[in-house]
Amino acid sequence: MAAKKPVNWWLWTKMLLGGAAICVGGPAFTYWLTPTDEELFQKYNPELQKRSLERRFERQQEFDDFVTKLKEYSKSDKPIWTVQAEAEEKERQQRASVQKSLALADEVKARKEAMRREAGLPLEK
């Protein structure tokens, strides 16, 4: 029977230490190098800082609306993208009906004005 090969403990120790250094050190190095939001903001030129501050509330509101819609969509059994497409279609139809009713109201107003002109009555403002 052949003798067993001895285990190369030094090789395994180097491998484990190297793997641990990569697994722990890589993310730690990335975390250390990534600038914070404040550091990025300080690197903006003054005009961009001003514009960013002006639009901050608006962007936060848009994000909050987006998250609220996502929560609402996730309550459905359907996939989110399907529910989102249905909601967009419903909103598009609503806008079209509103535009149609506004056009109809303008047409009615124009007819009334034409009738008042024909009758010689004063026009409404």
From Swiss-Prot:
It holds the Pfam family CBP4. Keywords: Chaperone, Coiled coil, Membrane, Mitochondrion, Mitochondrion inner membrane, Transmembrane, Transmembrane helix. The chain crosses the membrane at residues 15-34. One of its GO terms (biological process) is mitochondrial respiratory chain complex III assembly. InterPro entries: Cbp4. The keyword Transmembrane helix applies. One of its GO terms (cellular component) is mitochondrial membrane. PANTHER family: ASSEMBLY FACTOR CBP4. The keyword Lyase does not apply. This is Assembly factor cbp-4. It is a single-pass membrane protein. Residues 98-118 form a coiled coil.
